Amino acid sequence: MIYRYIFWDNDGVLVDTERYYLQASREALARVNIELSNEQFAEISLAAGRSIFDIAVASGIPEQSIAELKEWRYRRYAELLEQEEIALDGAADVLKKLHGRLGMAVVTSSQKHHFEIIHRRTGFLDYFDFCLTREDYTRSKPSAEPYLLALKQCGCAAENVLVIEDSPRGLKAAKAAGLACWVIPGHHTSAQDFAEADRVLCGIREVMQLIL
C-alpha cells in the first residue's frame, strides 16, 4: 500500500504527556478522597475513551463539584506541561525526514490550550498541514468523527491514509473511519488489545523505516 498522508495522534505518540494527564487526574480525584490507579486510568481513559470523572459520578459526588474538579484538572495539567521538554525520543527526527515526502496532520483529543503549550517548544507544528484538537469536533475518539473530519480536510482517498496511534480508543476511531492504523503501545497501553491494528510497532522510528 502506498500511503500519501499520515494522521498522527499526539499524546503518547509524539509527546510524553499521558503521565502528566494521569497525575493531574489523580490529584483532582484525591481532592474528593477518590484514588485513581494506573489500571483504571488505562481502561477508562485510554481504552474506553470515557471521562475518569465517571468514577466521581459513581461515588455520588455532586455535579457542581465534578465541574469544579474538571476545571481544577485543566489548570493543573497546564502547569505540569510547562515543566520540562516532553517530545518523545525519535519524534523530531522522524517528522523532519518524512516532511515533504508525504502530507502529515495531527488528530488529537487534547484541548487546544494544552496542545499549544505542548508544542510551544517542540517545533513540530511546522511539519503538519493542519492539526485537529478537541474543540474541532463533537464526538471524541473512539468515535470515527475526528478522523473522518481529517480525511475530508486532507483530500486524500482513505486507502492512501495511515494513522499512527498508541491507544485502543484511537485504534477504534481509525478503524471506524476506514483507515489503516499502526499502533505504538506506550507505558499505559502496552497490555491492551491491539488485534485490529495493521501493525504494532516498537517505536516511532519504525514508522520511518517502513514508509521510506
What are these regions (language model features)?
Residues 1-4, 102, 111-212:
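Asp-based, Mg2+/Mn2+-dependent phosphohydrolase catalytic module
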Residues 2-93, 100:
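N-terminal helical cap/lid subdomain that shapes the substrate entry/recognition surface
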Residues 16, 43, 47, 64, ...:
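Residues at secondary-structure transition points
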Residues 25, 53-56, 73, 108, ...:
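Generic structural signal for conserved hydrophobic packing positions in ordered secondary structure
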Residues 35, 68, 97, 178, ...:
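Acidic/proline-rich low-complexity IDRs
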Residues 92-95, 171:
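Short amphipathic alpha-helical segments and helix-helix/interface helices
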